[in-house]
Amino acid sequence: MAALSDTAASHAFHPPARTTYLVLILCFLTIVAEGYDIGVMGTIVPSLLADANWKLTPIEIGAMGSAALFGTLIGSYFISVVSDLVGRKLLLIGCVTLFSLSMIGAGCAPTPWVFSVARFIGGLGLGGVISAAAALTIEFSPPEKRNLNFALMYSGYSFGALLSAVIGMAFLGSHGWRFVVALGAAPLLAVPFLFYMLPESLDFLIARGRHEKAAALARKLGIAPAELERNVRDPLPKPSVGAVFREVFSKQNALATISLWVAQVAAVMVIYGLGTWLPQLMRKMGYDLGSSLSFLAVFMLSSALGGILIGRISDFLGTRKTIVGGYVIGAIAISSLAIKSGLIMNYVLVALAGFGSIGVAMVQLGFIANYYRAHARASATGWAVGVGRFGAMSGPMVGAYLASRGADVQWNFYAFAGSALVAAVAIALTRSPHWSSASMTAGAISLKS
C-alpha cells in the first residue's frame, strides 16, 4: 500500500473538477478490481473445501489464501523502483494487467499448487495498484479535497470484495468457483481506457526532466502554467533512509512506532482472517451457502461506509479515541457472533464487525501518517503498512489452524476479537507526537509510491 504524507510529498496542483473526477473514478475502479481479487478467496472457500477433486484441508486452504498476500509483500518492495522508471500510470496499468491475467490462471488451475502460484503472481501486481492509484488520486485532487477523495478511492476495496460475495451468491451454485474466480479478469477490458483516459503523474514527468510533455499535459488538463512552472523550480525533496530511520526510531518515537506496528499487524490479521473465513464460519453456524455469502457482503458494505463515517467522527472526538473505540466495538461484535442468535442480529453484528475492523483501519492509516514529521511521513507509513502484511498472511492461517485442530467455530471469533482488542490497546498506549501538533496537516493527505 502506498504511504501517506502531508502536502510536502506532492505538489499542490489545482486541476479542474472534471480532471479530479475522471482520475478519482478510474482509480476507484482499479481498487474495486483489487478488492474483488483479494475478496474472492473468502467467497470460494466453502466451495473449495467441498471440491471432491482437490480434497483440500483447512491448512491448505489457509496457505492458498495467503499466497496472494505474500505476493503483495514481495511486490511492494519493488514498487518505488518500478514507479521511478515507468511512471505511476504505466505502473497502475501493468499491475492491473498482471493480477487480471493471474485470475485466469487461478480459475483454470489444474492443481492447488498452480492455483497458489497464480495467486502469488497476481499478488505481485496487487502490491502496486493501491500505491499508484492513491498517488494519482491525491496528485489530481485539490488540497482541501485530498482526505475525502482518498477515502472514496480506498473504499473501492470493500466494494470490490462486496462484489465478489454478490457474484458468488449468483453464480457459485450454477457455475462453480472457477467461473467466479475467472471473472476477476474482467478489468482487462478496461486497460485500453486507462491508457487513453488516465493522465500520467505531473510529478513524475517533472522529476524525469520531461518538462515539455508535462506542460502539454497540464494544458490538456486545464492546470495553470504558473503552477507547473513553480513546481519545476521547486522539485520534491527525497528524504534519505537514514533520516527516516532516525525519525521513526528516535528516543521519543521508538515505543510509539512499535505500538503502531503491533496495531497494524493485529488489525490486518482481523481483516484478512474474517475476509477469508467468515462465509465458512457462518456455514458451520448452520447457514446455507447463499446466506453465508450474504454475511460477507454485509461485512464489506459496512466497512466501506464505516470508513467514511469513522473519518467524520474522528474530526469531532479525536482520531486516537475514535480508533480505540471502533476496535472495541468490533471486538465485542466479533466475539458476540460466537453466541447463537437470530439472522437479523447476526447481520447487525457482522456489520459492526466490518465497521470496527476495515473501517477503523482506514482511519488508522491516517493516524500513523500524521504521527511523524513531514520529511519521514511517507516512508514511515509505508514501513508500517509493510509490517502489517505479516498480519494479512497470518490471518487466513489462524482460521486454518483452528479448523485443522477441530476447534469449535466459536474459537475463531474469539481469536479475531482478541486481535482487535490488541490493536485497540496498542493505539491507546501510543503517546501524542513529540513535535508540535500545530505542524500537523489535518486537511491534506498525499501519497508517495
Please provide the spans of the model-predicted regions.
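Transmembrane-helix signature of 12-pass secondary carriers
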Residues: 1-449
